[in-house]
């Protein structure tokens, strides 16, 4: 889902000159983990800097809301499909009955041999 504000993400600033621990070094090589080193990330709505954990929590909340709406829509469509399947079954029974009656009537009109 694209951000309508057109947020441009710039690469994180270089780490401080202090010597990083071994866990920080492995995290620093990952481009998707700027928050691991404590760098703030820009907020989607206000442009202010927010904690990466807070940003992830916001994204999880947005995803949960979207999934809830999707579940509601899926449930509504499912109910409509069940209703349509029932109607189709009833129509099939009706057509089969008519077919049988027409066949029976046709057979009764045939001359007996």
Swiss-Prot record:
It comes from the Eukaryota. This is Uncharacterized protein C4orf46 homolog. InterPro entries: RCDG1 (IPR031457). It is found in: Cytoplasm. It comes from Bos taurus. Keywords: Cytoplasm. GO terms for cellular component: cytosol. It holds the Pfam family RCDG1.
């Amino acid at each position: 889902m694209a951000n309508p504000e057109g947020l441009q993400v710039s690469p994180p600033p270089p780490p401080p000159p202090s010597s990083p621990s071994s866990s920080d070094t492995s995290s620093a090589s990952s481009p998707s983990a700027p928050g691991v080193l404590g760098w703030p990330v820009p907020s989607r709505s206000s442009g202010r800097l927010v904690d990466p954990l807070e940003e992830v929590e916001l994204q999880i909340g947005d995803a949960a809301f979207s999934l809830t709406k999707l579940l509601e829509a899926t449930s509504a469509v499912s109910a409509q499909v069940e209703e349509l399947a029932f109607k189709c079954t009833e129509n099939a029974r009706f057509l089969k009955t008519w077919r049988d009656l027409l066949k029976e009537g046709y057979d009764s009109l045939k001359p007996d041999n």
